[in-house]
Amino acid sequence: MQHKSPVVTWDLFGLDIKFNLASILMVIITSLIVLVIAIACTRNLQKRPTGKQNFIEWVFDFVRGIIESNLAWKKGGQFHFLTVTLILFIFVGNMLGLPFAIVIDHTLWWKSPTADATVTLTLATMVILLTHYYGIKMRGTKNYFKNYGQPFLALTPVNIFEEFTNTLTLGLRLYGNIYAGEILIGLLSSLIIGHAAWGWIIGVPGLIAWQAFSIFIGTIQAYIFIMLSMVYMSHKIADDH
């Protein structure tokens, strides 16, 4: 079944700017969940971690490993909290649309925020802009822009164009995987609801299997996003690139 999105349009200096209220709502909910996780896992920290503290320390160690695979910790350590926040936000966002969807008057309100290309491309743009900022900050303006003429000056347009393709692929890869997963979950749910016993026989096992696979895909996509983010960051701030 097709559902419409709660989109509002604002007229800004003659331009129609559209906002998906469901995506905004889900971004806020995702951010609040990440905030609650962070607060819950870092309260009453102990020298011998247990339970929730073990989990958050594992996340920090896991992310540190990703950073160190691309950058020396002396340079990459400053991105530790940023990368932890990103992986938690993307992972939680990927998971929110899996258990259920909330539809009111044929309008879809509850979904994964990362199933919206605007959200994922915004995240990707933010990351790419940060790579430029830190590249200039840590290498200097002259050395940073000189890098676009490497290895040959004639390749400058290609290197500039690559920045746009990196942004698109980083954002659309995440969006495509999560959106496709939610579409298939919706189709399987419709099969269960709209048909008799055979719909349950086919749909329920398929839905359970696809839910499990979607959890795996959502986890992998969160990992890929931050891994590529650190790869792009290393290309901008490393002296040998």
UniProtKB/Swiss-Prot annotation:
Keywords: ATP synthesis, Cell membrane, CF(0), Hydrogen ion transport, Ion transport, Membrane, Transmembrane, Transmembrane helix, Transport. InterPro entries: ATP_syn_F0_a_bact/chloroplast, ATP_synth_F0_asu, ATP_synth_F0_asu_AS, F0_ATP_A_sf. Gene3D superfamilies: ATP synthase, F0 complex, subunit A. Disulfide bonds: none annotated. It is found in: Cell membrane. It is a multi-pass membrane protein. The chain crosses the membrane at residues 21-41, 84-104, 116-136, 183-203, 207-227. One of its GO terms (biological process) is proton motive force-driven plasma membrane ATP synthesis. Key component of the proton channel; it plays a direct role in the translocation of protons across the membrane. Belongs to the ATPase A chain family. This is ATP synthase subunit a. It comes from Staphylococcus carnosus (strain TM300). The gene is atpB.
